[in-house]
Protein backbone atom coordinates (compact mmCIF):
# COMPACT_ATOMS: atom_id res chain seq x y z
CA UNK A 1 0.00 0.00 0.00
CA UNK A 2 1.15 3.53 -0.72
CA UNK A 3 0.64 6.28 1.85
CA UNK A 4 0.36 10.01 1.26
CA UNK A 5 2.27 10.67 4.47
CA UNK A 6 4.63 8.71 6.68
CA UNK A 7 4.55 10.35 10.12
CA UNK A 8 7.29 9.49 12.59
CA UNK A 9 6.08 9.77 16.19
CA UNK A 10 2.62 9.57 17.80
CA UNK A 11 2.96 12.41 20.31
CA UNK A 12 1.20 15.76 19.97
CA UNK A 13 3.05 16.85 16.82
CA UNK A 14 2.60 13.61 14.90
CA UNK A 15 -0.95 12.90 16.05
CA UNK A 16 -2.35 16.37 15.34
CA UNK A 17 -0.69 16.36 11.90
CA UNK A 18 -2.14 12.92 11.15
CA UNK A 19 -5.65 13.87 12.26
CA UNK A 20 -5.72 17.10 10.25
CA UNK A 21 -4.35 15.52 7.07
CA UNK A 22 -6.70 12.53 7.31
CA UNK A 23 -9.90 14.33 8.29
CA UNK A 24 -9.52 17.58 6.37
CA UNK A 25 -7.59 16.49 3.28
CA UNK A 26 -8.47 12.79 2.97
CA UNK A 27 -4.79 11.78 3.08
CA UNK A 28 -3.75 8.22 3.85
CA UNK A 29 -1.40 8.20 6.82
CA UNK A 30 1.01 5.71 8.37
CA UNK A 31 2.22 6.67 11.85
CA UNK A 32 5.35 4.88 13.03
CA UNK A 33 6.03 5.06 16.77
CA UNK A 34 9.06 3.53 18.50
CA UNK A 35 7.30 3.16 21.86
CA UNK A 36 4.55 0.67 22.67
CA UNK A 37 1.93 3.41 23.03
CA UNK A 38 0.58 6.59 21.45
CA UNK A 39 0.42 10.06 23.11
CA UNK A 40 4.17 10.63 23.51
CA UNK A 41 5.23 12.00 26.88
CA UNK A 42 1.60 12.94 27.64
CA UNK A 43 0.72 9.22 27.89
CA UNK A 44 -1.29 8.35 30.98
CA UNK A 45 -2.51 5.04 32.35
CA UNK A 46 -4.10 3.52 35.43
CA UNK A 47 -1.50 2.11 37.80
CA UNK A 48 -1.96 -1.15 39.72
CA UNK A 49 -3.84 0.77 42.44
CA UNK A 50 -6.39 2.20 40.00
CA UNK A 51 -4.95 5.73 40.02
CA UNK A 52 -4.61 7.53 36.68
CA UNK A 53 -0.97 8.64 36.49
CA UNK A 54 1.18 10.36 33.89
CA UNK A 55 3.94 7.91 33.01
CA UNK A 56 6.36 10.67 32.04
CA UNK A 57 5.55 13.17 34.77
CA UNK A 58 2.79 15.77 35.18
CA UNK A 59 1.38 17.27 31.99
CA UNK A 60 -0.95 20.20 32.63
CA UNK A 61 -2.88 21.61 29.72
CA UNK A 62 -2.96 25.40 29.59
CA UNK A 63 -3.27 27.82 26.69
CA UNK A 64 -4.38 31.28 25.69
CA UNK A 65 -5.21 30.04 22.20
CA UNK A 66 -8.91 29.61 21.55
CA UNK A 67 -8.07 27.77 18.32
CA UNK A 68 -5.96 25.17 20.14
CA UNK A 69 -8.54 24.71 22.91
CA UNK A 70 -11.45 24.33 20.48
CA UNK A 71 -9.47 21.93 18.32
CA UNK A 72 -8.63 19.58 21.21
CA UNK A 73 -12.22 19.88 22.49
CA UNK A 74 -13.26 17.77 19.49
CA UNK A 75 -11.59 14.79 21.17
CA UNK A 76 -12.20 15.27 24.88
CA UNK A 77 -14.41 16.76 27.53
CA UNK A 78 -12.53 18.78 30.11
CA UNK A 79 -12.12 19.01 33.86
CA UNK A 80 -11.39 22.52 35.13
CA UNK A 81 -8.02 22.47 36.83
CA UNK A 82 -5.61 25.22 37.89
CA UNK A 83 -2.18 23.90 38.76
CA UNK A 84 -0.49 24.94 42.00
CA UNK A 85 3.09 24.27 43.07
CA UNK A 86 4.84 24.80 46.38
CA UNK A 87 8.60 25.11 46.80
CA UNK A 88 10.06 23.08 49.65
CA UNK A 89 12.92 25.15 51.07
CA UNK A 90 14.47 23.70 54.23
CA UNK A 91 11.18 21.99 55.06
CA UNK A 92 9.04 25.10 54.68
CA UNK A 93 6.58 25.55 51.81
CA UNK A 94 6.37 28.66 49.64
CA UNK A 95 4.26 29.45 46.56
CA UNK A 96 6.02 29.12 43.20
CA UNK A 97 6.22 31.21 41.03
CA UNK A 98 7.56 33.68 43.62
CA UNK A 99 4.82 36.11 44.62
CA UNK A 100 3.83 38.46 47.44
CA UNK A 101 2.98 35.53 49.74
CA UNK A 102 6.44 34.01 49.13
CA UNK A 103 8.20 37.28 49.95
CA UNK A 104 6.08 37.98 53.05
CA UNK A 105 6.64 34.49 54.48
CA UNK A 106 10.34 34.28 53.65
CA UNK A 107 11.35 37.72 54.89
CA UNK A 108 8.67 38.20 57.56
CA UNK A 109 7.19 41.14 55.68
CA UNK A 110 3.58 42.30 55.59
CA UNK A 111 3.29 43.76 52.11
CA UNK A 112 -0.30 44.32 50.99
CA UNK A 113 0.15 45.87 47.55
CA UNK A 114 1.84 45.05 44.26
CA UNK A 115 3.80 48.30 44.47
CA UNK A 116 5.35 47.39 47.82
CA UNK A 117 6.58 44.08 46.43
CA UNK A 118 7.76 45.74 43.23
CA UNK A 119 9.71 48.28 45.30
CA UNK A 120 11.19 45.43 47.34
CA UNK A 121 12.38 43.64 44.19
CA UNK A 122 13.83 46.93 42.95
CA UNK A 123 15.76 47.33 46.21
CA UNK A 124 17.36 43.87 46.03
CA UNK A 125 17.85 43.37 42.29
CA UNK A 126 21.31 43.50 40.73
CA UNK A 127 21.28 45.02 37.28
CA UNK A 128 22.67 42.74 34.61
CA UNK A 129 23.14 44.10 31.13
CA UNK A 130 23.17 42.36 28.75
CA UNK A 131 21.11 39.36 29.90
CA UNK A 132 23.23 36.45 28.71
CA UNK A 133 22.04 33.46 30.75
CA UNK A 134 19.53 32.14 33.29
CA UNK A 135 21.39 33.55 36.28
CA UNK A 136 21.33 37.03 34.74
CA UNK A 137 17.60 37.01 34.04
CA UNK A 138 16.65 36.18 37.65
CA UNK A 139 19.28 38.22 39.51
CA UNK A 140 18.37 41.19 37.33
CA UNK A 141 14.77 40.91 38.58
CA UNK A 142 15.01 39.83 42.22
CA UNK A 143 18.65 39.79 43.31
CA UNK A 144 20.99 37.11 44.62
CA UNK A 145 19.17 35.80 47.71
CA UNK A 146 15.92 34.80 46.00
CA UNK A 147 17.93 33.49 43.05
CA UNK A 148 20.07 31.27 45.28
CA UNK A 149 17.14 30.06 47.38
CA UNK A 150 14.65 29.21 44.63
CA UNK A 151 16.47 28.96 41.32
CA UNK A 152 20.16 28.08 41.57
CA UNK A 153 20.10 24.62 43.16
CA UNK A 154 16.85 23.52 41.53
CA UNK A 155 18.12 24.48 38.08
CA UNK A 156 21.47 22.78 38.69
CA UNK A 157 19.70 19.56 39.73
CA UNK A 158 17.35 19.76 36.77
CA UNK A 159 19.99 20.37 34.10
CA UNK A 160 23.32 19.41 35.76
CA UNK A 161 24.51 22.82 34.63
CA UNK A 162 24.77 26.08 36.52
CA UNK A 163 22.12 28.62 35.49
CA UNK A 164 24.91 30.80 34.09
CA UNK A 165 25.58 28.02 31.57
CA UNK A 166 21.98 27.97 30.32
CA UNK A 167 20.03 30.24 28.01
CA UNK A 168 17.91 32.95 29.68
CA UNK A 169 14.86 31.10 28.31
CA UNK A 170 15.21 28.32 30.93
CA UNK A 171 14.60 30.36 34.09
CA UNK A 172 12.85 33.04 32.07
CA UNK A 173 9.90 30.64 31.65
CA UNK A 174 9.00 31.23 35.30
CA UNK A 175 7.34 34.59 36.05
CA UNK A 176 8.14 36.78 39.04
CA UNK A 177 4.91 38.10 40.60
CA UNK A 178 4.01 41.01 42.85
CA UNK A 179 0.43 39.85 43.58
CA UNK A 180 -0.91 36.88 45.56
CA UNK A 181 -1.90 34.75 42.56
CA UNK A 182 -0.55 31.31 43.47
CA UNK A 183 -1.58 29.51 40.28
CA UNK A 184 1.38 28.16 38.35
CA UNK A 185 -0.15 29.33 35.07
CA UNK A 186 -2.37 32.30 34.29
CA UNK A 187 -3.60 31.18 30.85
CA UNK A 188 -7.23 31.70 29.85
CA UNK A 189 -7.86 27.98 29.31
CA UNK A 190 -6.66 25.65 32.08
CA UNK A 191 -8.10 22.15 32.03
CA UNK A 192 -7.28 18.46 32.17
CA UNK A 193 -8.76 15.99 29.66
CA UNK A 194 -11.67 14.45 31.58
CA UNK A 195 -10.75 10.84 30.76
CA UNK A 196 -7.02 11.45 30.41
CA UNK A 197 -4.61 12.25 27.60
CA UNK A 198 -4.38 8.73 26.17
CA UNK A 199 -8.16 8.60 25.59
CA UNK A 200 -7.97 11.98 23.88
CA UNK A 201 -5.25 10.71 21.55
CA UNK A 202 -7.21 7.53 20.82
CA UNK A 203 -10.16 9.61 19.64
CA UNK A 204 -7.88 11.90 17.65
CA UNK A 205 -6.33 8.99 15.79
CA UNK A 206 -9.55 7.01 15.32
CA UNK A 207 -9.88 7.58 11.57
CA UNK A 208 -10.07 5.04 8.73
CA UNK A 209 -7.25 6.84 6.89
CA UNK A 210 -4.82 6.53 9.81
CA UNK A 211 -2.78 3.38 10.38
CA UNK A 212 -0.50 3.11 13.42
CA UNK A 213 2.59 0.94 13.80
CA UNK A 214 3.90 0.76 17.40
CA UNK A 215 7.20 -0.65 18.71
CA UNK A 216 8.83 0.29 15.42
CA UNK A 217 11.87 2.36 14.51
CA UNK A 218 10.97 4.12 11.27
CA UNK A 219 14.43 3.34 9.86
CA UNK A 220 13.57 -0.37 9.95
CA UNK A 221 10.59 0.05 7.59
CA UNK A 222 11.34 3.14 5.53
CA UNK A 223 12.94 1.31 2.59
CA UNK A 224 9.97 -1.05 2.25
CA UNK A 225 7.24 1.59 2.68
CA UNK A 226 5.83 3.65 -0.16
CA UNK A 227 4.89 7.22 0.68
CA UNK A 228 4.88 10.67 -0.91
CA UNK A 229 5.83 12.87 2.03
CA UNK A 230 7.17 12.53 5.56
CA UNK A 231 6.50 14.43 8.77
CA UNK A 232 9.30 13.74 11.24
CA UNK A 233 8.80 14.51 14.95
CA UNK A 234 11.70 12.52 16.41
CA UNK A 235 15.17 13.72 17.41
CA UNK A 236 16.68 15.57 14.45
CA UNK A 237 20.21 14.33 15.18
CA UNK A 238 19.03 10.71 14.95
CA UNK A 239 17.45 11.40 11.55
CA UNK A 240 20.85 12.45 10.22
CA UNK A 241 22.71 9.62 11.98
CA UNK A 242 24.42 12.07 14.36
CA UNK A 243 26.63 13.38 11.54
CA UNK A 244 27.25 16.68 13.39
CA UNK A 245 27.31 15.09 16.84
CA UNK A 246 24.65 14.12 19.37
CA UNK A 247 22.32 16.80 20.69
CA UNK A 248 22.07 16.41 24.48
CA UNK A 249 18.75 16.01 26.29
CA UNK A 250 17.80 15.75 29.91
CA UNK A 251 15.67 12.83 30.92
CA UNK A 252 13.93 11.90 34.17
CA UNK A 253 13.97 8.75 36.25
CA UNK A 254 10.74 8.26 38.18
CA UNK A 255 10.22 6.54 41.50
CA UNK A 256 6.58 5.74 42.26
CA UNK A 257 4.87 5.31 45.60
CA UNK A 258 1.29 4.52 46.54
CA UNK A 259 0.25 5.58 50.02
CA UNK A 260 -2.83 5.11 52.17
CA UNK A 261 -4.05 8.69 52.13
CA UNK A 262 -6.94 10.50 50.51
CA UNK A 263 -4.66 13.51 50.02
CA UNK A 264 -0.94 13.73 50.73
CA UNK A 265 0.33 17.12 49.53
CA UNK A 266 -0.92 20.68 50.10
CA UNK A 267 -0.51 21.33 46.37
CA UNK A 268 -0.31 19.01 43.37
CA UNK A 269 3.48 19.33 43.12
CA UNK A 270 6.32 20.23 45.46
CA UNK A 271 9.55 21.54 43.95
CA UNK A 272 12.57 20.72 46.11
CA UNK A 273 14.78 23.75 45.66
CA UNK A 274 17.56 22.84 48.10
CA UNK A 275 20.65 20.66 47.68
CA UNK A 276 19.70 18.06 50.30
CA UNK A 277 17.25 16.05 48.16
CA UNK A 278 18.41 14.44 44.92
CA UNK A 279 14.91 14.61 43.45
CA UNK A 280 13.51 17.82 42.02
CA UNK A 281 9.79 17.28 42.31
CA UNK A 282 7.02 15.21 43.89
CA UNK A 283 3.60 15.09 42.22
CA UNK A 284 0.29 13.74 43.52
CA UNK A 285 -1.78 12.80 40.48
CA UNK A 286 -5.23 12.56 42.08
CA UNK A 287 -5.20 16.30 42.60
CA UNK A 288 -5.04 16.76 38.82
CA UNK A 289 -7.56 14.12 37.82
CA UNK A 290 -10.08 14.60 40.65
CA UNK A 291 -10.17 10.87 41.34
CA UNK A 292 -11.62 9.73 44.65
CA UNK A 293 -9.72 6.86 46.22
CA UNK A 294 -8.54 5.61 49.60
CA UNK A 295 -4.95 5.60 48.36
CA UNK A 296 -2.86 8.10 46.45
CA UNK A 297 -0.03 7.67 43.92
CA UNK A 298 2.94 10.03 43.79
CA UNK A 299 6.03 10.26 41.61
CA UNK A 300 9.50 11.44 42.59
CA UNK A 301 11.57 12.91 39.75
CA UNK A 302 15.32 12.40 39.44
CA UNK A 303 16.84 14.22 36.44
CA UNK A 304 19.37 12.22 34.43
CA UNK A 305 21.09 12.10 31.05
CA UNK A 306 20.01 8.46 30.58
CA UNK A 307 16.65 7.45 29.11
CA UNK A 308 13.94 9.01 26.96
CA UNK A 309 14.57 12.48 25.55
CA UNK A 310 12.56 14.96 27.66
CA UNK A 311 14.13 18.39 27.53
CA UNK A 312 16.42 19.95 24.91
CA UNK A 313 19.27 21.72 26.73
CA UNK A 314 19.24 25.32 25.52
CA UNK A 315 22.66 26.93 25.38
CA UNK A 316 24.88 28.44 22.68
CA UNK A 317 26.95 25.30 22.10
CA UNK A 318 23.92 23.08 21.49
CA UNK A 319 22.24 25.74 19.40
CA UNK A 320 25.19 25.73 17.00
CA UNK A 321 24.90 21.96 16.55
CA UNK A 322 21.15 22.21 16.01
CA UNK A 323 21.57 24.91 13.38
CA UNK A 324 23.78 22.57 11.35
CA UNK A 325 21.04 19.93 11.41
CA UNK A 326 18.36 22.50 10.61
CA UNK A 327 20.33 23.70 7.58
CA UNK A 328 20.66 20.11 6.42
CA UNK A 329 16.92 19.49 6.92
CA UNK A 330 16.04 22.47 4.74
CA UNK A 331 17.72 20.80 1.77
CA UNK A 332 15.22 17.94 1.88
CA UNK A 333 12.05 18.18 -0.17
CA UNK A 334 8.82 16.57 1.03
CA UNK A 335 10.07 16.11 4.62
CA UNK A 336 8.73 18.37 7.35
CA UNK A 337 10.46 18.55 10.75
CA UNK A 338 8.13 19.65 13.54
CA UNK A 339 7.91 19.30 17.33
CA UNK A 340 10.09 19.53 20.42
CA UNK A 341 12.58 16.86 19.39
CA UNK A 342 12.93 17.65 15.72
CA UNK A 343 13.19 21.41 16.32
CA UNK A 344 15.26 21.01 19.51
CA UNK A 345 13.03 23.48 21.28
CA UNK A 346 11.30 23.45 24.66
CA UNK A 347 7.70 23.73 23.43
CA UNK A 348 4.67 23.46 25.70
CA UNK A 349 1.93 21.09 24.54
CA UNK A 350 -0.34 23.87 23.30
CA UNK A 351 2.55 25.44 21.39
CA UNK A 352 3.15 22.19 19.52
CA UNK A 353 -0.55 21.83 18.70
CA UNK A 354 -0.75 25.43 17.49
CA UNK A 355 2.40 25.06 15.42
CA UNK A 356 1.14 21.89 13.73
CA UNK A 357 -2.29 23.38 13.02
CA UNK A 358 -0.63 26.34 11.28
CA UNK A 359 1.94 24.17 9.50
CA UNK A 360 -0.62 21.74 8.08
CA UNK A 361 -2.77 24.64 6.85
CA UNK A 362 0.23 26.29 5.21
CA UNK A 363 1.55 23.12 3.59
CA UNK A 364 -1.83 22.06 2.22
CA UNK A 365 -2.48 25.34 0.40
Predicted regions mapped to residue ranges:
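Glycine-rich FAD pyrophosphate-binding loop
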Residues: 22-48
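Structural/interface elements that position substrates and couple domains in central-metabolism enzymes
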Residues: 70-71, 137, 146, 265, ...
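N-terminal Rossmann-like FAD-binding beta1-loop-alpha1 element of flavoenzymes
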Residues: 3-31, 360
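C-terminal catalytic lobe of FAD-dependent flavoproteins
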Residues: 312-365
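Mid-domain catalytic core of redox enzymes
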Residues: 24, 216-328
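Short, solvent-exposed loop/turn segments at secondary-structure junctions
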Residues: 12-13, 36-38, 101, 156, ...
Amino acid sequence: MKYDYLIVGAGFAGSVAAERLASQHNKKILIVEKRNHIAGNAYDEFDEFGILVHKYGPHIFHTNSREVFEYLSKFTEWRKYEHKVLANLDGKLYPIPINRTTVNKLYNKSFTSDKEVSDFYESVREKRNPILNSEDIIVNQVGTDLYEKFFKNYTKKQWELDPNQLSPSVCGRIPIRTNTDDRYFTDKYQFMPKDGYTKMFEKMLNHPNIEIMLNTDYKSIINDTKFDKMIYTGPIDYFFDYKFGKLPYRSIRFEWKNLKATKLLKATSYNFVGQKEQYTRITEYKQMTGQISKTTSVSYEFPTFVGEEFYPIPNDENDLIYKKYKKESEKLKNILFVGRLSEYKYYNMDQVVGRVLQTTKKNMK
